Regions:
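Short, surface-exposed loop/helix-turn segments at secondary-structure junctions
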Residues: 257-269
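Short secondary-structure boundary/hinge segments and terminal tails
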Residues: 67-68, 266, 291
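RNA pseudouridine synthases
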Residues: 1-192, 196-203, 300-305
Length: 308
């Protein structure tokens, strides 16, 4: 009698099979939790898992052995124990699986080269990293952050995943938010800016009327006002080049450190563009699992609002 063939696993099933998952039921530190779940593993072995960045807490790579776990958190251990160590002062990897890499990049680092700019980028750094596991490996661009903007962004690890993310971006991404410090005290607590943006190569122009440019929509919420500044959260309905920077200029409150869009000649107390992509939430393009990534506001942003 012929053996019955097992049905092939779907990509989603294969992706989920790469991890062993545990639910946290009581408060404890990460090392204690791992020791309880893997009683035969030595402390050295457990520390090795952390240093190799194969342990995740709520989908974020965690290397801190005394990380405080709370009930309801999810701990995952990747079965890919051969992952290469990664240390780079310009970006850090916050999540990685067989299909995507989520990073936090520093200000000053280009996402991707343009024809006019031939220098080290997040794209080239990540390509060098994945090619340590195989020369045929590479990353694929999904979206970009401006050079002077810091924060969370995502790359795909294969062409099919890249296509899915680009084609269905607005369905897949549920929340994409930025924090900015702008000049002056914003008049409204919240509002929406709509304009048509045109890329003029050296700058992006904005029109309140349809002049053939790309319709662009930014929602804003004022978090705090103090010392002649406003701390803003910004939610992009569209994702055009320099969109937030241009829209803040349109409101008469340019972003601190933005010499291109309204901030020229104005003192810059933090020495950088005060714009950071702090939140990215999306449905995984293969497993359909909801992924949520968030970083704190940059400390130098918050310092501007301390009592003087």
């Amino acid at each position: 009698m012929a053996k019955e063939k097992r049905p092939k696993r779907t990509p989603a099933e294969k992706a989920r099979a790469q991890y062993t998952g545990y639910l946290v039921k009581e408060p404890m530190d990460l090392m204690g939790f791992l020791a309880a779940k893997m009683p035969d593993a030595s402390r050295t072995k457990l520390k090795s898992l952390l240093s190799k960045r194969v342990v995740y807490v709520d989908n974020v790579i965690t290397t801190q052995f005394d990380f405080a776990l709370k009930p309801g958190m999810k701990v995952q251990i990747s079965k890919d124990k051969g992952r290469k160590e990664f240390n780079n002062r310009l970006l850090k990897i916050v999540y990685e699986d067989a299909f995507i890499i989520v990073i936090e990049k520093k200000e000053g680092l280009l996402s991707v080269n343009t024809e006019r700019q031939k220098e080290r980028t997040a794209y080239t750094i990540l390509n060098e990293y994945v090619q340590r596991s195989g020369k045929h490996h590479r990353v694929y661009v999904v979206h970009r952050l401006d050079r002077d903007t810091s924060g969370i962004m995502m790359f795909a690890k294969d062409e099919k995943t890249q296509h899915t993310l680009r084609e269905y971006w607005h369905d897949i991404v549920t929340d994409r938010r930025y924090v900015a410090v702008v000049e002056g005290e914003m008049e409204k607590d919240h509002g929406t800016v709509t304009s048509w943006l045109t890329d003029r190569i050296l700058y992006v122009s904005s029109s309140q009327y349809d002049d053939g440019g790309s319709k662009s929509i930014t929602h804003y919420h004022t978090i705090k006002r103090a010392n002649g500044y406003s701390l803003m959260e910004l939610d992009l309905e569209t994702g055009r080049k320099n969109q937030i920077r241009v829209h803040m200029q349109d409101l008469g409150h340019p972003i601190i450190g933005d010499g291109r869009y309204g901030g020229e000649g104005v003192p810059n107390p933090i020495g950088r563009l005060a714009l950071h992509a702090f939140k990215l939430c999306f449905y995984h393009p293969v497993t359909n699992e909801l992924m949520e990534f968030e970083t704190p506001y940059p400390p130098n942003f918050k310092k501007l609002f301390l009592k003087q």
